[in-house]
Amino acid sequence: MVQISEVQEQSSTAYTRTAAHTHIKGLGLDEFGVAKQVEGGFVGQAEAREACGVIVDLIKAKKMSGKAILLAGGPSTGKTALALAISQELGPKVPFCPLVGSELYSVEVKKTEALMENFRRAIGLRIKETKEVYEGEVTELTPEEAENPLGGYGKTISHVIVGLKSAKGTKTLRLDPTIYESIQREKVSVGDVIYIESNTGAVKRVGRSDAFATEFDLEAEEYVPLPKGEVHKKKEIVQDVTLHDLDVANARPQGGQDVISMMGQLMKPKKTEITEKLRHEVNKVVAKYIDQGVAELVPGVLFIDEVNMLDIEIFTYLNRALESDIAPVVVLASNRGMITVRGTDDVVSPHGVPPDLIDRLLIVRTLPYNREEIKTIISKRAAVENLQVEDEALEFLATLGTETSLRYVLQLLSPSGIIAKIANRAEISVADVEEAKLLFLDAKRSTKILEQSENYL
């Protein structure tokens, strides 16, 4: 007997990568804006989450643009998680541009230019366009000729009569001779389903009407059903772009399709700066669209982590950029206390931010987690990583988290899971965590070893 067996499909969901903040789903607030103790992947930090909830409401109401927020707190207190939760609460339609302070330093592009680029990335433009479309099956296609106005025996096409049929009726259109050229290019014949944009005169052949599907043809045709509704339709198309997209489109016009221009594009890998004049022109066009009601400005969020890495020049530029007419909400994060502002010798300021900018910021403080909160976070994270942890091991990890750091115990979960798997255990035990702890040092133990072997290393 011939052996036949089915190959089981492996689902791709089992191989999704688990990142540091995969478990964050939102701020975890109720309908009154009050933070629940454990919700949306967050544990604790009630005051900070409620403050971010107010900020989200202000952004949605478009009353927050041009203002800046500082998330201040120690390492592993959830500053990046809060910024990520803000972006998830706002949804995919609101631009969210994350970057680290050190990203702004480049050999090719000025620091201020790199900052302005990210500013423009965080501002969206929603363009609404109403398109009038004629769609249907071609029942008649008659070009009408007229005498050539230049004389001679030749004839010119004055207009084209096209009959279109849809499920709800038929229409006969008189089209411009320029549209006839598009019809010829698309090789349209009677029985084809086409649509014509009335604004641009663009013609698109969708396919052959399925009424002709029984015809024998040597060429393989794509048969489509008769369009539903009326022949004349109005469609509203919404496009979401950022101001940076518009800047780039105008700064680098596409070359031709010939070999020379394509080679030219390959030979120019250097990043070109977008001039202030070009941005001003783009802003003018955007303002005109907004006045006409065609477009709507969507101020997004620019998140700058490790803000203490920025220098005094960038901070000075940031002051001016925040006061401009078109500015996003800027969220800064810092885990430093009183330090010298980069680029200065004697200006010591909180969080590494100059005093004049600190005065403009709304500061949200994140607090260290207590033992119970660390325990809840570990159990949540273990569930995300599909790991089972014994109660004793969970208690041990929570105690270890208070002695070392939250990040260290979260990073111990995966190695402990592998050790438990090798020992054929379904759940992670205290012995597995102890073994992983011996294999991987935390920062305090590593520092202690370095101090003891000071003369050796």
UniProtKB/Swiss-Prot annotation:
Top-level taxon of the source organism: Eukaryota
Protein location: Nucleus
GO cellular component, one term: nucleus
Keywords carried by this UniProt record: Activator, ATP-binding, Chromatin regulator, DNA damage, DNA repair, Helicase, Hydrolase, Nucleotide-binding, Nucleus, Transcription, Transcription regulation
One GO molecular-function entry: helicase activity
Principal EC category: hydrolase
GO terms for biological process, alphabetical: chromatin organization; DNA repair
Binding positions for ATP per the UniProt entry: G73, G74, P75, S76, T77, G78, K79, T80
Primary location group: nucleus
Gene3D superfamilies in alphabetical order: 1.10.8.60, P-loop containing nucleotide triphosphate hydrolases, RuvB-like helicase, domain II
Reactions catalysed according to its record: ATP + H2O = ADP + phosphate + H(+)
KW ATP-binding (keyword) present: yes
Enzyme Commission identifier(s): 3.6.4.12
Purpose: DNA helicase which participates in several chromatin remodeling complexes, including the SWR1 and the INO80 complexes. The SWR1 complex mediates the ATP-dependent exchange of histone H2A for the H2A variant HZT1 leading to transcriptional regulation of selected genes by chromatin remodeling. The INO80 complex remodels chromatin by shifting nucleosomes and is involved in DNA repair. Also involved in pre-rRNA processing.
Assigned protein family: Belongs to the RuvB family.
Subunit structure: May form heterododecamers with RVB2. Component of the SWR1 chromatin remodeling complex, the INO80 chromatin remodeling complex, and of the R2TP complex.
Descriptive protein name: RuvB-like helicase 1
Organism: Kluyveromyces lactis (strain ATCC 8585 / CBS 2359 / DSM 70799 / NBRC 1267 / NRRL Y-1140 / WM37) (Yeast)
This protein's encoding gene: RVB1
